[in-house]
Amino acid sequence: MSQERGTTLYYGWKIVAAILFTLTFSSGLSFYNHSIYLNALAATPAFNVASASIAVSLFFFSGGLAGLLVARWVQNYDPRYCLTGGAVISAGALSALSYVTTVPQLYVVYCIFGMGFSASSLIPATTIVARWFKRRRAMALSIASTGLSLGGVILTPLCVLLVEKLSFQTAAPIMGLIYLVGVIPVSWIWLRPSPESMGLRIDGDAVDEESVPTRDTAKQDKTRPSSSAPIEDGLSFR
């Protein structure tokens, strides 16, 4: 019998809710906010629409390259470290946008921003969810990924108000701080790297009675080499 069917809510669903929350902030303050940042920059004499558009392309290019390393890293280590590092990098790059004065500076900052976004968004998020679910993985991933859209719906209008009321130079560091607060605390308070880290099984399944060793099997185990337990597939999102 699985934990999902009992009276206790399977902790994996709390993981889904936490991932939805973090994706709301990481996507809302990066992916959906490019128009806000670039409009503010293009309004200054040092930049124009063409240079700002190239910066967005560099964001996705650098994020794609970084994603190759991020995907490999999160398979072997706790994804919460990746989310934390990515949030710090993204927040720093976002804050730095208010200080750029030349086109090369803009391109460098946007490349760094893209790498931070890659490390704090979909790749580590879906990896964690996939570790907690097998039978309902598609449902869990679809719910968690809703945060990508919520970021644009909720945070983008708020960021527009910040820029209008405070100016971009003042609002950018504030948005960077919001990025940190929206990702890091939730990652360490509610996220866990795997069910095994909490003494649970994937999907909340209970331990089979057949897997509990008896006296006879215990004696047999002493006379033969031990074998490693099978590792549950789910480290990568397919």
What are these regions (language model features)?
Residues 41, 119-133:
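Intracellular juxtamembrane helix-capping segments at the cytosolic ends
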Residues 65-104:
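Conserved MFS/SLC helix-loop-helix module at the cytosolic interface between two early adjacent transmembrane helices
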Residues 14-49, 67-70, 156:
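Extracytoplasmic
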Residues 1-22, 225-238:
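Cytosolic juxtamembrane N-terminal segment immediately preceding the first transmembrane helix
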Residues 143-144, 148-198:
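Helix-loop-helix hairpin linking two adjacent transmembrane segments in secondary transporters
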